[in-house]
Amino acid sequence: MNAKKILAMILALCLMLMATACGSTTPQSQIKGDLNINGQIEVGQEGVDVEVNLSDVHMDAAEAFAAGHWEALFTPVQIEGRALDMLNFDLTPTAEEKAAMEKEPAYGKPVVYMMSDGCTSGPTVADDLKYYTEAGLTADGLKGMSVVEALGTGKATVAVNHIATMLVPITNGVDMTFVGGAHIGCKTLYVLNDSQYKTTEDLKGTNISVPNGIGNTDYNITCMMLDADGINPQTDVTLMQVTADACVSAMERGEISACLLSDSFAYAMVKDGKLRAIRSLLDEDFAHNNCCVIAMNRTYVEQNPVHAKKIIQAVQKAHSFMRENTAEATQYLLDRGWNAGDFDMNVMLNGSMQFGTTDAFTQASLKQIVDNYLRLGLIQSMNNADEIMALAWRPVLD
């Protein structure tokens, strides 16, 4: 066995051990609002009403602030071929599908989905709306474990999460793969509103917080944002971990210049005049890329191709419901505690994410992300983009 393969196995083992530690974190020690146990606060602030001024036109983050119309960032960029329409799709297995399912190892066993909230709640919504049942499946939810550990060990079958969370572990040998597109957007780089930082160029030579740590989701996303603007994330800035709940205080003390936050958590502080956005995954150049994808245990997909297809059909039908009926879906999520904060804010933010992306859109965005990760050195255990795509991208819809 060559040294590269041994190193990849060691990295994968270390990642799994780290994930186990994360999964065993007690609720008392978790950051309040960190619903997905990933170091970020994904939901809005309870009991805080904010004024929402909708816009008919899209503006990128810095432009929207300069124009005094912050909400223009959340008007979706219209992209042909992005939306996958499965709202009226009949999930009932055909006779041929049913016969094939009966021959697969997963037949008669429940689908285990990662119970998640907010923008990653598609698999949970699919169960609540009985879409798995319609697809001829039974389902159980799993909580309290990282998505990488749960999918990689086969304890969970399916989940929605960030490409930035899962891509590097896949290249390090974790047994999972991407099977469909979930949504765009949801993370933005924020500074203090009264600071001197107007663009990412102004951040050179400063410290920037990536709340869930070096090498994790926020680190990878921030690297991509800075790189897109010609800023070297390894040499032009210092990326460091300050948790989401402590970022504002750290900025006020001058310890960091900026912080990557979820838009739902930051929104009330923006409206209160505390924060300002300077770069976002909703900016037009990033709106052509998925932020989050549907992932499954890779061995499960290989051994149960028809089960995998029916599972993804169910999740994508849930995503279509969330996209096409945004207000209804938002109230639905709020009623179940899967969104938090102001209703109008959540309607706008949920609408901006354009849930349920086509395989063609997802494949194109994933290929670009793989190329960027290789160039930036974020992936180190593999160096061939085609081989990475073959490992990480296994679409299951016909």
Q: Where do the model's predicted regions map?
A:
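Bacterial N-terminal signal peptides that target proteins for export
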Residues: M1-I10
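C-terminal solvent-exposed extensions
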Residues: D371-D398
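Short, glycine-/small- and polar/acidic-enriched structural segments
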Residues: Q28-Q234, T238-Q241, S257-D263, K274-L281, ...
